[in-house]
């Protein structure tokens, strides 16, 4: 019956049944786990039988009582996992949204800006003072170290591989000729872009933009779900370069702190995931998720955090783009610090949220916190971007504080009542891992659909490790129709193939190395031609091939280039292909 429902509604409603309707069912199921019962306001669009939806009724009966809708005393964890896997699997498939949903996302971006301005105008002096006191308690030492590095000129920028608002790609970024007056006051072009002082005669060719003439960030959408796209902002090359330098200094300084590494993370999600499991096991910890998290962090809050650190304050302001070009709305001035796209968005949003979380805990305890008190909260409080862990007995005060300062808590993805918890891509119920495997790309029709083939092979192998072996058997049959050679390989092999607990295949031995070889398809992705010479090439060598010595970031030794063609080709590949090769199975 369930299979017929999926088949019939998919035929009638199209792919949106799999990508929107079923995921909504899954989210309502998670909400029911948190509430401890099934509410009649949930599961809209599905027929009911008794106190539960008829769809997936066999699984639901193992979790909830059908007569009352209440959670069973001993709910079946396998049934919880099955329902989540079946309903949420296609929720984040990478497909373009409709034009109407794209326009709505851009309009929401504009409305979010208005909300930030409104929140700024309503913030009282008492709020501001409390925020500054907590921020100083947490970050003053860290900021002082970075402030000192900026004063002594120890910051070194870095170019990333992504797109930029001024459309410079790959090696072109090392020949940039545009800077801003605000950057020039903190990070002089000659000191940071010219490889040595002997090139200072080229200064006259540099275009130093005054504040009113700066290039705005370009706001674009990228696939997230079929329901709504993700909104990001593409930064100008100059801003992106300087942001990376400050980011590196901030992360180095944070790691040296005696408290902060235990409360906030930037490159390791596992601590959040482990705490989420604890919360699902004993109910002591809540997991919170924020909507439009980075877009709701006010620039005024960031300025307040840095007010006692003048050099860092000026630098962070200098690398912030003040305007954004929004499709359909023109160029607007930004009230937020920055959207996703700036290298500093992630750390500053996390630091602002940590400050607000501890302010909420302080209010709940009705006493001011000191650093010793904060240290005792390690293992109970953890921030990773907009994924937040807090003690359950402080959650309402924390939520109130976050929303008072302009954040928006996503109640559909925040959990603290029952025994379901979610953080940083892991989900737990009663201490058991009920995380799912997601289908990311459309099904490939032929071998030349390389991106989809690669994604499907990865999906198959994830399903294998999750124990869905019957599904893997069906997927293997489908993949063999697309890939003539589809061997069993180790996870470390670059060959597209099946993973197995039973080892790997060997088709022949290497003639000279006498090591195993297997015939299969490997990923082929070449960076576009992008030749670089002259001072730009020398700058790239100094910036990317220098081993940095601690927080001072001075060169300790120089290494040979990792890619001998890096001065001829650079940037992200325009296309990805798969080619048949003899390669190592491990």
Task: Enumerate the language-model features and the residues they cover.
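C-terminal, non-catalytic extensions of nucleic-acid polymerases
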Residues: 1-229, 462-586
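Active-site-proximal segment of RNA-dependent polymerases
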Residues: 233, 237-288
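A conserved non-catalytic segment of reverse transcriptases
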Residues: 417-464
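Conserved polymerase palm-domain catalytic core
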Residues: 280-384, 389-405, 412-427, 445-448, ...
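Conserved PLP-enzyme active-site core in the AAT-like
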Residues: 265-272, 398, 405, 429
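Short acidic (Asp/Glu) and glycine-rich catalytic loops that position anionic groups and cofactors
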Residues: 223-227, 282, 328-332, 431-434
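Positively charged, low-complexity nucleic-acid-binding target-recognition regions
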Residues: 331, 362-371, 436-442, 458-469, ...
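Short helix/loop capping segments that flank catalytic or ligand/cofactor-binding pockets
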Residues: 220, 230-232, 242-243, 295-298, ...
């Amino acid at each position: 019956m369930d299979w017929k429902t999926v088949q019939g509604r998919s035929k009638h409603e199209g792919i949106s049944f799999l990508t929107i309707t079923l995921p909504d069912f899954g989210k309502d199921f998670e909400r029911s786990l948190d509430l401890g019962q099934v509410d009649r306001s949930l599961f809209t669009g599905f027929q009911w039988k008794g106190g539960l939806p008829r769809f997936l009724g066999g699984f639901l009966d193992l979790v909830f009582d059908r007569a009352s809708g209440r959670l069973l005393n001993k709910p079946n964890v396998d049934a919880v996992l099955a329902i989540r896997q079946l309903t949420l699997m296609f929720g984040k498939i990478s497909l373009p949204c409709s034009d109407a949903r794209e326009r709505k996302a851009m309009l929401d971006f504009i409305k979010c800006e208005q909300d930030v301005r409104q929140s700024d105008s309503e913030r009282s002096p008492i709020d501001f003072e409390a925020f500054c006191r907590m921020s100083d308690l947490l970050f003053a030492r860290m900021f002082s170290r970075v402030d000192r590095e900026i004063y002594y000129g120890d910051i070194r920028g870095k170019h990333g591989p992504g797109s930029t608002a001024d459309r410079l790609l790959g090696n072109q970024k090392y020949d940039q000729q545009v800077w801003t007056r605000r950057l020039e006051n903190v990070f002089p072009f000659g000191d940071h872009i010219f490889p040595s002082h002997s090139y200072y005669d080229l200064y006259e060719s540099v275009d130093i933009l005054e504040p009113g003439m700066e290039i705005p960030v370009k706001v674009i959408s990228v696939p997230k779900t079929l329901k709504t796209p993700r909104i990001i902002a593409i930064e100008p090359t100059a801003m992106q370069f300087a942001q990376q330098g400050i980011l590196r200094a901030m992360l180095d300084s944070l790691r040296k702190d005696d408290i902060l590494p235990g409360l906030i993370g930037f490159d390791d999600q596992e601590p959040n995931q482990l705490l989420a499991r604890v919360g699902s096991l004993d109910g002591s910890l809540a997991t919170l998720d924020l909507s439009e998290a980075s877009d709701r962090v006010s620039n005024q809050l960031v300025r307040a955090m840095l007010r006692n650190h003048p050099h860092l304050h000026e630098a962070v302001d200098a690398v912030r783009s003040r305007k954004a070009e929004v499709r359909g709305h023109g160029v607007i001035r930004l009230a937020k610090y920055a959207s996703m796209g700036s290298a500093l968005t992630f750390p500053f949003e996390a630091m602002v949220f940590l400050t607000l979380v501890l302010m909420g805990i302080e209010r709940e305890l009705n006493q001011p916190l000191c650093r010793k008190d904060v240290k005792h909260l390690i293992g109970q409080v953890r921030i990773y971007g907009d994924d937040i862990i807090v003690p359950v007995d402080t959650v309402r005060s924390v939520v109130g504080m976050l929303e008072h300062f302009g954040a928006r808590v996503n109640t559909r993805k925040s959990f603290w009542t029952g025994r379901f918890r979610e953080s940083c891509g892991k989900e737990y119920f009663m201490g058991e891992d009920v995380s799912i495997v997601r289908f990311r790309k459309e099904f490939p029709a032929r071998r030349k659909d390389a991106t989809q083939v690669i994604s499907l092979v990865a999906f198959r192998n994830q399903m294998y490790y999750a124990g869905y072996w019957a599904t893997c058997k069906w997927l293997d049959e489908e993949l063999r129709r697309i890939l003539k050679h589809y061997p069993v390989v180790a996870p470390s092999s670059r060959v597209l193939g099946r993973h197995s607990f039973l080892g790997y295949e060997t088709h022949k031995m290497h003639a000279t190395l006498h090591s195993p070889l297997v015939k299969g398809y490997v990923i082929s992705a070449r960076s576009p031609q992008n030749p670089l010479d002259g001072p730009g090439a020398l700058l790239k060598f100094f910036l990317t091939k220098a081993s940095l010595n601690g927080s001072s970031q001075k060169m300790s030794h120089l290494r040979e280039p990792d890619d001998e063609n890096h001065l001829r080709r650079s940037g992200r590949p325009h296309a990805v292909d798969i080619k048949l090769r003899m390669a190592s199975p491990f």
